[in-house]
Amino acid sequence: MLALYQPDIPQNCGTMLRLCACLGVEAAIIEPAGFPVSDRHFRRAGMDYLDQVALSRHVSFTAFRAWQIETGRRLVLLSTKASQPYTDFTFRPDDILLMGRESAGVPEAVHASADARVVIPLRPPMRSLNVAVAAAMVLGEALRQVGALAKVMDAPRASL
């Protein structure tokens, strides 16, 4: 699952949901988002793929965290403050990859509540990648590790 913490740029959110649709990954939006889901930029970035995403919405991080604990899934935060490279981390099929806000990441309390934290190594003085690019990189590695990419490749293709 790819979870988006209070996304504030509709184009990035739409792009990440499109990524989830294409790879068969569940998605969650942790409210409040910085835009309505009817936003034209959000819909345009997601194109007609948004209807193909298994999407859940949570009214707050507290509600999301309660759901996450109840389901027993591990919360893996992608953070520029983490020390473990995502390529050295062992992902599990039921992991939830949490992406922070484009403008501010996540608050310290959310950071501390994650079961694990991973980082994409960048050369100095670069600070971060676009959140949708970062999500694609780490989600791709997680799916590769758990063998889920092969399932995507074996799935029947939609007709044009």
From Swiss-Prot:
Known EC number: 2.1.1.207
Gene3D superfamilies recorded: 3.40.1280.10
UniProt enzyme class: transferase
SUPFAM superfamilies named in the record: alpha/beta knot (SSF75217)
GO cellular component terms, semicolon-separated: cytoplasm
Keywords associated with the record: Cytoplasm, Methyltransferase, S-adenosyl-L-methionine, Transferase, tRNA processing
Localisation: Cytoplasm
Record flagged with keyword tRNA processing: yes
InterPro entries: Alpha/beta_knot_MTases, SpoU_MeTrfase, TrmL, tRNA_m1G_MTases_N
GO MF annotation terms: RNA binding; tRNA (5-carboxymethylaminomethyluridine(34)-2'-O)-methyltransferase activity; tRNA (cytidine(34)-2'-O)-methyltransferase activity
Function summary: Methylates the ribose at the nucleotide 34 wobble position in the two leucyl isoacceptors tRNA(Leu)(CmAA) and tRNA(Leu)(cmnm5UmAA). Catalyzes the methyl transfer from S-adenosyl-L-methionine to the 2'-OH of the wobble nucleotide.
PANTHER family assigned to the protein according to its UniProt record, in alphabetical order: TRNA (CYTIDINE(34)-2'-O)-METHYLTRANSFERASE
Family in the record: Belongs to the class IV-like SAM-binding methyltransferase superfamily. RNA methyltransferase TrmH family. TrmL subfamily.
Entry protein name: tRNA (cytidine(34)-2'-O)-methyltransferase
Source species of the chain: Beijerinckia indica subsp. indica (strain ATCC 9039 / DSM 1715 / NCIMB 8712)
Gene giving rise to this polypeptide: trmL
